[in-house]
Amino acid sequence: MAENQKIQQIDCTKVPEPTLRRLPWYLSNVKLLKQRGERFVSSTQISKEINIDASQIAKDLSYVNISGRTRVGYEVDALIEVLEHFLGFTEIHKAFLFGVGSLGGALLQDSGLKHFGLEIVAAFDVDPTLVGTNLNGIPIYHSDDFLKKMEEYDVQIGVLTVPIEIAQCITDMMVDGGIKAVWNFTPFRIRVPEDIVVQNTSLYAHLAVMFNRLNFNEIK
């Protein structure tokens, strides 16, 4: 790392959510540039690759407090390191998954999640054809065994992929059992205590946005 390049992390809770959503895009792009042999990268270079204004990129990167060289930019290796650390990708966060349907099963088979710091160590369902089996080496237990498994695993994150009708019920069970953060893939807005972290990722909502923009473009 260059001597005149300073890296210092700040309180992540002060970072706007839109910035947190963009930082992984920058990280992925910088990794691609590294594969191409680039040693330094500027906000302008990243801007051209991902079509985000260079001033916005520079502002976003200011939250992780990394300063580059004048007329040269950021050192690629240093930028990758600080972004991965800032985003929590350098540590493994263990998680339980609830609901081994099509989406849940796909997440269990997504080995790429571990590269971003998330390891699903067990899954829960009530389907007798699934309970007692494993998928991608991940054991599937009955939902009734959740509390017992919480004693065996060091888990704070729950991934919610159950039917919408039981989303709140399963969420309550998770929170009562000690889960501190919920990655919610259902279209239901779950209710949790203030100290519980919730990240809503509704595929249907993203579809609605895409369809709306597609229709708008067609009638222009």
Curated annotation (Swiss-Prot):
It comes from Bacteroides thetaiotaomicron (strain ATCC 29148 / DSM 2079 / JCM 5827 / CCUG 10774 / NCTC 10582 / VPI-5482 / E50). The lineage of its organism: Bacteria, Pseudomonadati, Bacteroidota, Bacteroidia, Bacteroidales. One of its GO terms (cellular component) is cytoplasm. PANTHER family: REDOX-SENSING TRANSCRIPTIONAL REPRESSOR REX (PTHR35786), REDOX-SENSING TRANSCRIPTIONAL REPRESSOR REX 1 (PTHR35786:SF1). This is Redox-sensing transcriptional repressor Rex. Gene3D superfamilies: NAD(P)-binding Rossmann-like Domain (3.40.50.720), Winged helix-like DNA-binding domain superfamily/Winged helix DNA-binding domain (1.10.10.10). Its main location: cytoplasm. InterPro entries: CoA-bd, NAD(P)-bd_dom_sf, Rex_DNA-bd_C_dom, Tscrpt_rep_Rex, WH-like_DNA-bd_sf, WH_DNA-bd_sf. GO terms for molecular function: DNA binding; DNA-binding transcription factor activity. Modulates transcription in response to changes in cellular NADH/NAD(+) redox state. Keywords: Cytoplasm, DNA-binding, NAD, Repressor, Transcription, Transcription regulation. Pfam families: CoA_binding (PF02629), Put_DNA-bind_N (PF06971). NCBIfam families: PRK05472.2-3, PRK05472.2-4, PRK05472.2-5. GO terms for biological process: negative regulation of DNA-templated transcription; response to redox state. NAD(+) binds at residues 99-104. Homodimer. It is found in: Cytoplasm. The gene is rex. The keyword NAD applies. Belongs to the transcriptional regulatory Rex family. Residues 25-64 bind DNA.
